[in-house]
Amino acid sequence: MTTTRNNSPTDGLEEPVGEDQEPAAPVTTGRGPLGLLDRHPYLVVAVVAAMVGTAHAVWIWTHRHLGAFDPDEAGYIANALRFQRSIDLGNPMAFVRTVGGTGTGPVVPFLSLPFLLLGPRDPRMAMMVQPVLLVVSALAVAGIARRLAGPRTAVAAGLVWATLPTVALATQSYWLGLGAATFAALAVWALLESDRLTNRWTYAYGACIALMAMSRTMAVAFAPALGLAGVVVAGRDKKAWWGLVKAGLVAVAMAGPWWLVNWDSLTEYLFSYGYGKRAALFGQGTVVDRIWFRLTRIGESTNLSTASDWSNPVQAVVAVTVASSAWSVGRDYRKDRTLPAGLRGGLAVGAAVVAGIAALASTTNNGVWFELPVVVLLVPLTLAAASRGWWGLRVVLGAAFLAFGVWTLGRSLWLIGPGTSQPPRSAHYEDGFAQYDTRFSSDRRDQLAAATADWRATNRRVFRTLAELVPTGDPVPATVSGNMVLLNANSLALQAELDVVDFRPEIPDTVRSTRERAKFLAPTTTDSGGTEIERLLVLELHDKILFTPDEKVRDFARQARAAGWKVVGTVPLPTGGVVEILRHRDNL
Protein backbone atom coordinates (compact mmCIF):
# COMPACT_ATOMS: atom_id res chain seq x y z
CA MET A 1 0.00 0.00 0.00
CA THR A 2 1.31 3.47 -0.89
CA THR A 3 0.24 6.98 -0.20
CA THR A 4 1.35 10.26 -1.73
CA ARG A 5 2.55 13.40 -0.11
CA ASN A 6 4.42 16.56 -0.92
CA ASN A 7 8.08 15.61 -0.46
CA SER A 8 9.73 18.59 -2.12
CA PRO A 9 11.17 21.66 -0.43
CA THR A 10 9.04 23.57 -2.92
CA ASP A 11 5.36 22.96 -3.51
CA GLY A 12 3.45 20.74 -5.92
CA LEU A 13 5.85 17.82 -6.40
CA GLU A 14 4.60 14.49 -5.12
CA GLU A 15 6.13 11.06 -4.99
CA PRO A 16 5.05 7.72 -3.52
CA VAL A 17 6.36 6.85 -0.09
CA GLY A 18 5.79 4.03 2.35
CA GLU A 19 2.88 4.41 4.71
CA ASP A 20 5.28 4.24 7.67
CA GLN A 21 7.13 7.33 6.51
CA GLU A 22 6.40 10.75 7.89
CA PRO A 23 4.68 13.28 5.61
CA ALA A 24 5.98 16.78 5.28
CA ALA A 25 4.16 19.67 6.91
CA PRO A 26 1.04 20.54 4.92
CA VAL A 27 1.24 23.29 2.32
CA THR A 28 -1.24 26.16 2.49
CA THR A 29 -1.43 28.63 -0.34
CA GLY A 30 -2.68 32.15 0.27
CA ARG A 31 -3.13 35.09 -2.01
CA GLY A 32 -1.03 38.20 -2.49
CA PRO A 33 2.11 38.48 -0.34
CA LEU A 34 1.14 35.41 1.69
CA GLY A 35 0.86 33.45 -1.53
CA LEU A 36 4.44 34.39 -2.36
CA LEU A 37 5.57 33.07 1.01
CA ASP A 38 3.67 29.83 0.45
CA ARG A 39 4.91 29.25 -3.09
CA HIS A 40 8.50 30.48 -2.83
CA PRO A 41 9.64 30.50 0.82
CA TYR A 42 13.28 29.84 -0.03
CA LEU A 43 13.37 32.59 -2.61
CA VAL A 44 12.05 35.09 -0.07
CA VAL A 45 14.59 33.99 2.54
CA ALA A 46 17.43 34.00 0.01
CA VAL A 47 16.66 37.52 -1.22
CA VAL A 48 16.28 39.08 2.24
CA ALA A 49 19.25 37.19 3.70
CA ALA A 50 21.36 38.22 0.70
CA MET A 51 20.49 41.86 1.36
CA VAL A 52 21.49 41.45 5.01
CA GLY A 53 24.67 39.63 3.99
CA THR A 54 25.56 42.35 1.49
CA ALA A 55 25.20 44.98 4.20
CA HIS A 56 27.56 42.98 6.41
CA ALA A 57 30.02 42.58 3.53
CA VAL A 58 30.11 46.34 2.99
CA TRP A 59 30.63 46.86 6.73
CA ILE A 60 33.48 44.34 6.75
CA TRP A 61 35.20 46.09 3.87
CA THR A 62 34.88 49.55 5.39
CA HIS A 63 35.34 48.79 9.12
CA ARG A 64 37.52 45.71 9.60
CA HIS A 65 41.03 47.12 9.69
CA LEU A 66 44.14 44.96 9.46
CA GLY A 67 45.29 45.83 12.97
CA ALA A 68 41.92 44.89 14.46
CA PHE A 69 41.89 41.12 14.07
CA ASP A 70 41.92 39.05 17.22
CA PRO A 71 44.47 36.22 17.47
CA ASP A 72 42.08 33.50 16.30
CA GLU A 73 40.92 35.55 13.33
CA ALA A 74 44.52 36.35 12.38
CA GLY A 75 45.45 32.67 12.48
CA TYR A 76 42.46 31.55 10.43
CA ILE A 77 42.98 34.28 7.83
CA ALA A 78 46.67 33.37 7.65
CA ASN A 79 45.56 29.79 6.94
CA ALA A 80 43.35 30.96 4.08
CA LEU A 81 46.19 33.00 2.59
CA ARG A 82 48.58 30.07 3.00
CA PHE A 83 46.10 27.76 1.26
CA GLN A 84 46.00 30.19 -1.64
CA ARG A 85 49.79 30.46 -1.74
CA SER A 86 50.15 26.67 -1.85
CA ILE A 87 48.07 26.29 -5.02
CA ASP A 88 50.43 24.99 -7.69
CA LEU A 89 49.08 23.21 -10.76
CA GLY A 90 52.47 21.58 -11.20
CA ASN A 91 52.48 20.24 -7.64
CA PRO A 92 48.88 19.68 -6.47
CA MET A 93 50.01 17.63 -3.47
CA ALA A 94 51.51 20.76 -1.92
CA PHE A 95 48.00 22.15 -1.59
CA VAL A 96 46.67 18.87 -0.18
CA ARG A 97 49.47 18.74 2.41
CA THR A 98 48.94 22.36 3.41
CA VAL A 99 45.20 22.00 3.91
CA GLY A 100 45.38 18.53 5.44
CA GLY A 101 48.12 19.49 7.88
CA THR A 102 46.27 22.49 9.29
CA GLY A 103 45.72 22.09 13.02
CA THR A 104 42.54 24.17 13.13
CA GLY A 105 39.34 23.67 11.16
CA PRO A 106 40.27 24.02 7.46
CA VAL A 107 36.79 24.26 5.94
CA VAL A 108 36.07 27.99 6.34
CA PRO A 109 39.57 29.07 5.18
CA PHE A 110 39.17 26.67 2.26
CA LEU A 111 35.84 28.26 1.35
CA SER A 112 37.56 31.66 1.34
CA LEU A 113 39.73 30.63 -1.60
CA PRO A 114 37.34 31.69 -4.40
CA PHE A 115 37.24 35.21 -2.98
CA LEU A 116 41.02 35.38 -2.65
CA LEU A 117 41.51 34.01 -6.16
CA LEU A 118 39.05 36.47 -7.69
CA GLY A 119 39.91 39.53 -5.59
CA PRO A 120 42.92 41.15 -3.95
CA ARG A 121 45.05 39.23 -1.46
CA ASP A 122 43.47 41.09 1.41
CA PRO A 123 42.23 39.70 4.76
CA ARG A 124 38.86 41.29 4.13
CA MET A 125 38.47 39.27 0.93
CA ALA A 126 38.89 36.09 2.97
CA MET A 127 36.18 37.36 5.31
CA MET A 128 33.68 37.66 2.46
CA VAL A 129 32.84 33.99 2.93
CA GLN A 130 31.08 34.87 6.20
CA PRO A 131 28.13 36.74 4.60
CA VAL A 132 27.75 33.82 2.20
CA LEU A 133 27.59 31.43 5.15
CA LEU A 134 24.93 33.70 6.65
CA VAL A 135 22.75 33.25 3.56
CA VAL A 136 23.33 29.50 3.34
CA SER A 137 22.60 28.99 7.04
CA ALA A 138 19.41 31.07 6.76
CA LEU A 139 18.24 28.82 3.92
CA ALA A 140 19.10 25.72 5.97
CA VAL A 141 17.13 27.06 8.95
CA ALA A 142 14.22 27.77 6.61
CA GLY A 143 14.51 24.25 5.22
CA ILE A 144 14.27 22.71 8.67
CA ALA A 145 11.29 24.87 9.60
CA ARG A 146 9.61 24.10 6.26
CA ARG A 147 9.76 20.39 7.00
CA LEU A 148 8.45 20.90 10.53
CA ALA A 149 5.70 23.47 10.08
CA GLY A 150 5.29 24.70 6.51
CA PRO A 151 6.49 27.54 4.27
CA ARG A 152 5.40 30.54 6.32
CA THR A 153 7.23 29.29 9.38
CA ALA A 154 10.20 28.62 7.10
CA VAL A 155 10.32 32.28 6.06
CA ALA A 156 9.97 33.47 9.65
CA ALA A 157 12.69 31.15 10.94
CA GLY A 158 15.17 31.97 8.18
CA LEU A 159 14.78 35.72 8.66
CA VAL A 160 14.87 35.54 12.47
CA TRP A 161 18.12 33.60 12.27
CA ALA A 162 19.66 36.04 9.78
CA THR A 163 19.02 38.98 12.11
CA LEU A 164 20.04 37.54 15.49
CA PRO A 165 22.74 39.48 17.39
CA THR A 166 25.08 36.51 17.64
CA VAL A 167 24.74 35.78 13.92
CA ALA A 168 25.41 39.42 13.03
CA LEU A 169 28.62 39.50 15.06
CA ALA A 170 29.72 36.07 13.81
CA THR A 171 29.19 37.23 10.22
CA GLN A 172 31.39 40.26 10.79
CA SER A 173 34.14 38.14 12.32
CA TYR A 174 36.41 35.42 10.98
CA TRP A 175 35.71 32.90 13.68
CA LEU A 176 34.69 29.38 12.72
CA GLY A 177 31.44 29.10 14.69
CA LEU A 178 29.26 30.29 11.82
CA GLY A 179 30.72 27.66 9.53
CA ALA A 180 30.09 24.92 12.10
CA ALA A 181 26.52 26.13 12.63
CA THR A 182 25.88 26.29 8.88
CA PHE A 183 26.89 22.68 8.30
CA ALA A 184 25.01 21.51 11.40
CA ALA A 185 21.84 23.08 10.00
CA LEU A 186 22.49 21.68 6.53
CA ALA A 187 22.96 18.22 8.05
CA VAL A 188 19.62 18.36 9.86
CA TRP A 189 17.86 19.76 6.80
CA ALA A 190 19.25 16.91 4.71
CA LEU A 191 18.16 14.43 7.38
CA LEU A 192 14.59 15.73 7.30
CA GLU A 193 14.57 15.57 3.49
CA SER A 194 15.91 12.02 3.41
CA ASP A 195 12.59 10.13 3.68
CA ARG A 196 13.83 8.58 6.91
CA LEU A 197 17.32 8.00 5.53
CA THR A 198 16.20 6.19 2.37
CA ASN A 199 17.10 8.59 -0.45
CA ARG A 200 20.15 10.50 -1.68
CA TRP A 201 19.77 13.20 0.98
CA THR A 202 21.13 10.57 3.36
CA TYR A 203 24.60 11.05 1.90
CA ALA A 204 24.31 14.82 2.22
CA TYR A 205 23.42 14.33 5.89
CA GLY A 206 26.65 12.41 6.49
CA ALA A 207 28.74 14.79 4.40
CA CYS A 208 27.51 17.84 6.28
CA ILE A 209 28.28 16.21 9.64
CA ALA A 210 31.82 15.69 8.37
CA LEU A 211 32.12 19.29 7.20
CA MET A 212 30.84 20.49 10.57
CA ALA A 213 33.47 18.39 12.35
CA MET A 214 36.16 19.93 10.13
CA SER A 215 34.85 23.48 10.42
CA ARG A 216 35.80 23.93 14.06
CA THR A 217 37.62 21.36 16.16
CA MET A 218 35.25 21.64 19.13
CA ALA A 219 32.27 21.09 16.80
CA VAL A 220 33.07 17.37 16.81
CA ALA A 221 31.26 17.37 20.17
CA PHE A 222 28.01 18.05 18.29
CA ALA A 223 28.40 15.03 15.98
CA PRO A 224 26.72 12.69 18.51
CA ALA A 225 23.82 15.15 18.78
CA LEU A 226 23.29 15.06 15.02
CA GLY A 227 23.67 11.29 15.09
CA LEU A 228 20.98 11.12 17.79
CA ALA A 229 18.68 13.10 15.52
CA GLY A 230 19.25 10.43 12.89
CA VAL A 231 18.37 7.70 15.38
CA VAL A 232 15.07 9.44 16.20
CA VAL A 233 14.24 9.78 12.52
CA ALA A 234 15.12 6.15 11.83
CA GLY A 235 12.97 4.79 14.64
CA ARG A 236 12.48 1.03 14.27
CA ASP A 237 12.77 1.01 10.50
CA LYS A 238 15.60 -1.38 9.51
CA LYS A 239 15.99 0.26 6.12
CA ALA A 240 16.38 3.62 7.82
CA TRP A 241 19.06 2.20 10.12
CA TRP A 242 21.01 0.99 7.10
CA GLY A 243 20.77 4.53 5.76
CA LEU A 244 22.08 5.82 9.08
CA VAL A 245 25.07 3.50 8.77
CA LYS A 246 25.76 4.77 5.25
CA ALA A 247 25.60 8.37 6.45
CA GLY A 248 28.06 7.53 9.22
CA LEU A 249 30.45 5.92 6.75
CA VAL A 250 30.32 9.03 4.56
CA ALA A 251 31.06 11.24 7.57
CA VAL A 252 34.01 9.11 8.67
CA ALA A 253 35.39 8.82 5.13
CA MET A 254 35.34 12.60 4.70
CA ALA A 255 36.46 13.84 8.12
CA GLY A 256 38.49 10.83 9.26
CA PRO A 257 41.69 11.49 7.27
CA TRP A 258 42.07 15.05 8.56
CA TRP A 259 41.41 14.00 12.13
CA LEU A 260 43.86 11.09 11.86
CA VAL A 261 46.65 13.22 10.39
CA ASN A 262 46.27 15.82 13.14
CA TRP A 263 45.10 13.49 15.91
CA ASP A 264 47.78 14.25 18.49
CA SER A 265 47.60 18.04 18.23
CA LEU A 266 43.79 18.11 17.99
CA THR A 267 43.12 15.83 20.94
CA GLU A 268 45.82 17.42 23.10
CA TYR A 269 44.28 20.83 22.50
CA LEU A 270 40.66 19.74 22.91
CA PHE A 271 41.21 17.78 26.11
CA SER A 272 43.55 20.38 27.60
CA TYR A 273 41.22 23.31 26.99
CA GLY A 274 37.98 21.35 27.16
CA TYR A 275 38.45 19.11 30.17
CA GLY A 276 42.00 19.64 31.44
CA LYS A 277 43.44 22.20 33.82
CA ARG A 278 43.25 25.00 31.27
CA ALA A 279 39.51 24.59 30.81
CA ALA A 280 39.06 26.08 34.28
CA LEU A 281 40.86 29.23 33.14
CA PHE A 282 37.92 30.01 30.83
CA GLY A 283 35.04 29.24 33.18
CA GLN A 284 34.12 27.29 36.29
CA GLY A 285 31.09 26.00 38.15
CA THR A 286 28.93 22.94 38.61
CA VAL A 287 26.97 21.27 35.83
CA VAL A 288 23.90 23.27 36.87
CA ASP A 289 25.92 26.49 36.73
CA ARG A 290 27.17 25.60 33.27
CA ILE A 291 23.71 24.75 31.97
CA TRP A 292 22.38 28.06 33.30
CA PHE A 293 25.32 29.88 31.74
CA ARG A 294 24.66 28.28 28.36
CA LEU A 295 20.95 29.05 28.51
CA THR A 296 21.79 32.65 29.37
CA ARG A 297 24.20 32.80 26.43
CA ILE A 298 21.50 31.41 24.15
CA GLY A 299 19.06 33.99 25.51
CA GLU A 300 21.52 36.79 24.78
CA SER A 301 22.18 35.50 21.30
CA THR A 302 18.47 35.41 20.45
CA ASN A 303 17.46 38.77 21.95
CA LEU A 304 15.49 37.04 24.71
CA SER A 305 17.67 38.00 27.69
CA THR A 306 20.82 39.66 28.91
CA ALA A 307 23.38 37.98 31.12
CA SER A 308 21.71 39.15 34.32
CA ASP A 309 18.07 39.69 33.29
CA TRP A 310 15.56 37.13 32.11
CA SER A 311 12.58 39.47 32.46
CA ASN A 312 12.30 40.23 28.74
CA PRO A 313 8.54 40.12 27.98
CA VAL A 314 9.17 38.39 24.66
CA GLN A 315 10.11 35.29 26.64
CA ALA A 316 6.59 35.21 28.04
CA VAL A 317 5.09 35.72 24.58
CA VAL A 318 7.16 32.84 23.19
CA ALA A 319 6.18 30.58 26.09
CA VAL A 320 2.46 31.40 25.86
CA THR A 321 2.47 31.04 22.06
CA VAL A 322 4.11 27.61 22.29
CA ALA A 323 1.65 26.62 25.02
CA SER A 324 -1.32 27.71 22.91
CA SER A 325 0.14 25.82 19.96
CA ALA A 326 0.40 22.69 22.10
CA TRP A 327 -3.21 23.19 23.20
CA SER A 328 -4.25 23.42 19.55
CA VAL A 329 -2.40 20.21 18.70
CA GLY A 330 -4.01 18.45 21.66
CA ARG A 331 -7.46 19.67 20.64
CA ASP A 332 -7.00 18.34 17.11
CA TYR A 333 -5.74 15.03 18.43
CA ARG A 334 -8.75 14.60 20.67
CA LYS A 335 -10.98 15.42 17.72
CA ASP A 336 -9.62 13.11 15.01
CA ARG A 337 -6.58 11.33 16.52
CA THR A 338 -4.09 13.03 14.16
CA LEU A 339 -0.71 14.47 15.09
CA PRO A 340 1.26 17.18 13.26
CA ALA A 341 2.98 15.94 10.12
CA GLY A 342 6.40 17.15 11.27
CA LEU A 343 6.26 15.63 14.76
CA ARG A 344 8.99 13.01 14.27
CA GLY A 345 11.25 15.60 12.68
CA GLY A 346 10.55 17.99 15.53
CA LEU A 347 11.46 15.33 18.08
CA ALA A 348 14.69 14.68 16.16
CA VAL A 349 15.65 18.35 16.16
CA GLY A 350 14.69 18.64 19.82
CA ALA A 351 16.87 15.66 20.69
CA ALA A 352 19.79 17.27 18.87
CA VAL A 353 19.28 20.53 20.78
CA VAL A 354 19.18 18.78 24.17
CA ALA A 355 22.23 16.66 23.34
CA GLY A 356 24.04 19.75 22.08
CA ILE A 357 23.39 21.63 25.32
CA ALA A 358 24.61 18.58 27.24
CA ALA A 359 27.84 18.65 25.23
CA LEU A 360 28.28 22.34 26.02
CA ALA A 361 27.64 21.74 29.72
CA SER A 362 30.24 18.97 29.84
CA THR A 363 33.08 21.53 29.77
CA THR A 364 33.78 24.56 31.93
CA ASN A 365 35.31 26.37 28.94
CA ASN A 366 32.89 29.19 28.15
CA GLY A 367 34.23 29.71 24.64
CA VAL A 368 32.98 32.14 22.01
CA TRP A 369 30.08 31.17 19.76
CA PHE A 370 30.17 27.61 21.10
CA GLU A 371 26.36 27.77 21.21
CA LEU A 372 25.79 28.62 17.54
CA PRO A 373 25.27 25.01 16.35
CA VAL A 374 22.57 24.70 19.03
CA VAL A 375 20.94 28.06 18.31
CA VAL A 376 20.75 27.30 14.59
CA LEU A 377 18.52 24.31 15.41
CA LEU A 378 16.66 25.94 18.27
CA VAL A 379 15.33 28.78 16.07
CA PRO A 380 13.35 26.62 13.60
CA LEU A 381 12.31 24.25 16.39
CA THR A 382 10.89 27.07 18.53
CA LEU A 383 9.07 28.77 15.68
CA ALA A 384 7.68 25.44 14.50
CA ALA A 385 6.49 24.73 18.04
CA ALA A 386 4.75 28.12 18.07
CA SER A 387 3.34 27.86 14.55
CA ARG A 388 -0.10 26.63 15.63
CA GLY A 389 -0.47 29.13 18.46
CA TRP A 390 -3.19 31.73 18.66
CA TRP A 391 -3.13 34.14 15.75
CA GLY A 392 -2.83 37.27 17.88
CA LEU A 393 0.13 35.90 19.81
CA ARG A 394 1.90 34.95 16.59
CA VAL A 395 1.41 38.48 15.28
CA VAL A 396 2.89 39.94 18.48
CA LEU A 397 5.80 37.52 18.33
CA GLY A 398 6.47 38.32 14.69
CA ALA A 399 6.39 42.06 15.37
CA ALA A 400 8.81 41.63 18.27
CA PHE A 401 11.32 39.67 16.22
CA LEU A 402 10.99 42.16 13.37
CA ALA A 403 11.76 45.03 15.74
CA PHE A 404 14.66 43.12 17.28
CA GLY A 405 16.00 42.30 13.83
CA VAL A 406 15.95 45.92 12.67
CA TRP A 407 17.59 47.00 15.93
CA THR A 408 20.25 44.29 15.63
CA LEU A 409 21.16 45.32 12.10
CA GLY A 410 21.31 48.98 13.10
CA ARG A 411 23.64 48.20 15.98
CA SER A 412 25.84 45.71 14.14
CA LEU A 413 26.23 47.99 11.10
CA TRP A 414 27.03 50.93 13.39
CA LEU A 415 24.02 52.89 12.17
CA ILE A 416 22.95 53.02 15.83
CA GLY A 417 25.55 53.87 18.45
CA PRO A 418 26.88 51.37 21.01
CA GLY A 419 24.99 50.82 24.22
CA THR A 420 24.54 48.58 27.22
CA SER A 421 20.93 47.39 26.98
CA GLN A 422 19.86 45.45 23.90
CA PRO A 423 22.55 43.37 22.14
CA PRO A 424 24.72 43.62 20.18
CA ARG A 425 26.32 46.17 22.50
CA SER A 426 29.55 46.43 20.51
CA ALA A 427 31.53 44.71 17.80
CA HIS A 428 32.83 41.40 19.12
CA TYR A 429 36.41 42.63 19.47
CA GLU A 430 35.95 46.15 20.86
CA ASP A 431 35.69 45.45 24.59
CA GLY A 432 38.47 42.86 24.48
CA PHE A 433 40.84 45.06 22.51
CA ALA A 434 40.12 48.06 24.74
CA GLN A 435 41.86 46.21 27.59
CA TYR A 436 45.09 46.62 25.61
CA ASP A 437 44.47 49.94 23.88
CA THR A 438 41.58 52.15 25.01
CA ARG A 439 41.26 53.57 21.50
CA PHE A 440 39.44 50.35 20.56
CA SER A 441 36.64 51.08 23.03
CA SER A 442 33.16 51.21 21.50
CA ASP A 443 32.74 54.80 22.69
CA ARG A 444 35.92 55.90 20.85
CA ARG A 445 35.21 54.61 17.37
CA ASP A 446 36.56 57.79 15.82
CA GLN A 447 40.03 56.61 16.90
CA LEU A 448 39.72 53.08 15.49
CA ALA A 449 41.57 53.78 12.24
CA ALA A 450 44.53 55.36 14.04
CA ALA A 451 44.73 52.54 16.58
CA THR A 452 44.63 49.81 13.95
CA ALA A 453 47.24 51.64 11.84
CA ASP A 454 49.61 51.74 14.82
CA TRP A 455 49.26 48.06 15.59
CA ARG A 456 49.47 47.07 11.94
CA ALA A 457 52.73 49.02 11.63
CA THR A 458 54.07 47.39 14.80
CA ASN A 459 53.31 43.86 13.60
CA ARG A 460 54.82 44.64 10.21
CA ARG A 461 57.98 46.09 11.75
CA VAL A 462 58.49 43.15 14.12
CA PHE A 463 58.07 40.55 11.40
CA ARG A 464 60.21 42.35 8.84
CA THR A 465 62.97 42.80 11.40
CA LEU A 466 62.88 39.03 11.86
CA ALA A 467 62.82 38.37 8.13
CA GLU A 468 65.90 40.53 7.58
CA LEU A 469 67.89 38.12 9.75
CA VAL A 470 67.10 35.17 7.49
CA PRO A 471 68.36 34.58 3.92
CA THR A 472 65.82 35.68 1.32
CA GLY A 473 63.43 32.88 0.44
CA ASP A 474 64.12 30.84 3.58
CA PRO A 475 61.45 30.23 6.22
CA VAL A 476 61.52 32.46 9.29
CA PRO A 477 61.67 30.30 12.45
CA ALA A 478 60.95 32.10 15.71
CA THR A 479 60.11 31.29 19.30
CA VAL A 480 57.53 33.89 20.35
CA SER A 481 56.73 34.61 24.00
CA GLY A 482 54.78 37.34 25.74
CA ASN A 483 51.86 37.01 23.31
CA MET A 484 48.87 39.26 23.82
CA VAL A 485 45.77 40.06 21.79
CA LEU A 486 47.19 42.80 19.55
CA LEU A 487 50.61 41.27 18.86
CA ASN A 488 51.16 37.53 18.88
CA ALA A 489 52.37 34.59 16.85
CA ASN A 490 49.17 34.56 14.79
CA SER A 491 49.25 38.28 13.99
CA LEU A 492 52.88 37.84 12.91
CA ALA A 493 51.85 34.82 10.82
CA LEU A 494 49.23 36.97 9.10
CA GLN A 495 51.85 39.60 8.33
CA ALA A 496 54.14 36.87 7.01
CA GLU A 497 51.45 35.68 4.61
CA LEU A 498 50.83 39.22 3.41
CA ASP A 499 54.58 39.45 2.74
CA VAL A 500 54.44 35.98 1.11
CA VAL A 501 57.00 34.55 3.53
CA ASP A 502 56.94 31.19 5.28
CA PHE A 503 56.78 31.80 9.05
CA ARG A 504 57.39 28.96 11.55
CA PRO A 505 56.48 30.20 15.04
CA GLU A 506 56.78 28.25 18.27
CA ILE A 507 55.11 29.29 21.52
CA PRO A 508 56.86 27.99 24.64
CA ASP A 509 54.83 27.23 27.74
CA THR A 510 56.67 29.51 30.15
CA VAL A 511 54.67 28.19 33.11
CA ARG A 512 56.58 24.92 32.88
CA SER A 513 59.92 24.17 34.52
CA THR A 514 63.23 25.76 33.56
CA ARG A 515 64.34 22.43 32.14
CA GLU A 516 61.28 22.09 29.91
CA ARG A 517 61.63 25.68 28.69
CA ALA A 518 65.27 25.17 27.78
CA LYS A 519 64.47 23.26 24.58
CA PHE A 520 62.97 26.45 23.15
CA LEU A 521 66.25 28.27 23.80
CA ALA A 522 68.50 26.02 21.73
CA PRO A 523 70.48 28.08 19.16
CA THR A 524 69.04 26.06 16.28
CA THR A 525 65.87 24.31 15.23
CA THR A 526 64.93 22.28 12.14
CA ASP A 527 62.83 23.11 9.11
CA SER A 528 60.09 20.92 7.66
CA GLY A 529 62.70 18.86 5.83
CA GLY A 530 64.77 18.20 8.95
CA THR A 531 67.57 20.62 8.06
CA GLU A 532 69.12 22.47 10.99
CA ILE A 533 68.53 26.23 10.84
CA GLU A 534 69.02 29.19 13.16
CA ARG A 535 66.35 29.87 15.75
CA LEU A 536 65.25 33.46 16.43
CA LEU A 537 63.64 34.63 19.65
CA VAL A 538 60.86 37.21 20.09
CA LEU A 539 60.08 38.50 23.59
CA GLU A 540 57.13 40.83 24.15
CA LEU A 541 57.66 42.68 27.41
CA HIS A 542 54.66 44.72 28.58
CA ASP A 543 52.17 45.07 31.41
CA LYS A 544 49.10 43.88 29.47
CA ILE A 545 47.10 40.67 29.90
CA LEU A 546 49.15 37.71 28.68
CA PHE A 547 48.06 34.47 27.07
CA THR A 548 48.10 31.46 29.38
CA PRO A 549 51.43 29.95 28.16
CA ASP A 550 53.10 33.38 28.39
CA GLU A 551 52.48 34.17 32.05
CA LYS A 552 56.16 33.68 32.99
CA VAL A 553 57.63 35.49 30.00
CA ARG A 554 59.92 37.62 32.16
CA ASP A 555 61.36 34.50 33.82
CA PHE A 556 61.79 33.04 30.34
CA ALA A 557 63.54 36.24 29.22
CA ARG A 558 66.01 36.04 32.11
CA GLN A 559 66.65 32.39 31.32
CA ALA A 560 67.27 33.27 27.67
CA ARG A 561 69.84 35.94 28.51
CA ALA A 562 71.62 33.55 30.85
CA ALA A 563 71.70 30.99 28.02
CA GLY A 564 73.52 33.38 25.69
CA TRP A 565 70.73 35.14 23.79
CA LYS A 566 71.52 38.72 22.75
CA VAL A 567 69.12 41.52 21.76
CA VAL A 568 69.67 42.52 18.13
CA GLY A 569 66.56 44.64 17.62
CA THR A 570 63.73 46.31 19.50
CA VAL A 571 60.30 47.58 18.48
CA PRO A 572 58.30 49.80 20.88
CA LEU A 573 54.66 48.94 21.49
CA PRO A 574 52.03 51.66 20.89
CA THR A 575 50.75 51.46 24.47
CA GLY A 576 54.05 50.99 26.28
CA GLY A 577 56.46 48.12 26.52
CA VAL A 578 58.83 46.73 23.94
CA VAL A 579 59.35 43.77 21.65
CA GLU A 580 62.88 42.38 21.80
CA ILE A 581 64.31 40.32 18.97
CA LEU A 582 67.22 38.11 19.99
CA ARG A 583 69.81 35.83 18.41
CA HIS A 584 72.00 33.33 20.17
CA ARG A 585 75.63 34.30 20.58
CA ASP A 586 76.67 31.16 18.67
CA ASN A 587 74.95 32.57 15.58
CA LEU A 588 76.35 36.11 15.77
Predicted regions: what is each one?
Residues 193, 221-252, 328-337, 380, ...:
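Perimembrane helix-loop-helix junctions
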Residues 7, 147-152, 184-204, 212, ...:
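Membrane-interface transmembrane helices that cradle and orient dolichyl/undecaprenyl
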Residues 127-130, 166-180, 367-368:
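Short acidic/glycine- and proline-prone juxtamembrane loop motifs at membrane-interface regions
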